[in-house]
């Protein structure tokens, strides 16, 4: 799946970039909101001092995209003067993962040093496993675009622009969890390295202002703090994103 996603982004970059029309350099800023869909995943809890090392299989996650603070993000980038179809950008996005602990799940491993292999309501042991103050991606990205309906005066970069890109960077999390009635110490931490790929369309309403919509894919192996130990989960998410885009004069 990962190879297919990367291949799709690379092919998209080649196709979009290869047919782009000349234009001037362009700094830009995007602000956006959206909704994420995180795939079910196993959660592993390791609390060495307590004799706990167990896995909860196929945990479902709610996105809580519209709960305060909602899904939000911003991107600052630059398309090059010599290669106006090619750009770079720094992207920040905040979304959430909240485990549905009411469901019955398969537990395997050890609990209190004793073997554990049973189907139990997740909240029998893990009362809460949330990352609600953020799965926060900070990525450096390469991107390409293909300009349509260009006008030298009003829309020099194209009134409609197809774009695609990919990047990677640290994932900063703020986990909130409770295991066997003990809550974790809550704080921000770098929980892993994340990768993303995206593709979308940008429509300019004015020479310097427009709107855009895009699909985003993210993946990371998160390692977060739990009481007296660590919790691990593979985050694979699909996102639908929309917002405002601002094309800035190239000073």
Please identify what each model-predicted range represents.
Residues 14-22:
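C-terminal segment of classical bacterial N-terminal signal peptides
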Residues 22-26, 83-85, 157-161, 204-208:
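Strand-connecting loop/turn motifs
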Residues 23-80, 171-175, 239-251:
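Short glycine/proline- and aromatic-enriched beta-strand/turn motifs that initiate or cap beta-hairpins
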Residues 42-47, 100-106, 155, 174-183, ...:
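Outer-membrane beta-barrel translocator domains and adjoining extracellular loop/strand segments
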Residues 42-44, 50, 54, 60, ...:
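Predominantly the C-terminal beta-signal and adjacent terminal strand-loop region
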Residues 59-62, 124-131, 180-188, 225-233:
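Extracellular loop and loop/strand-boundary signature of outer-membrane beta-barrel proteins
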Residues 68-72, 134-138, 160, 189-195, ...:
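Residues that define the transmembrane beta-barrel architecture of outer-membrane proteins
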Residues 75-178, 241-251:
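Gram-negative (and chloroplast) outer-membrane scaffold detector with strong preference
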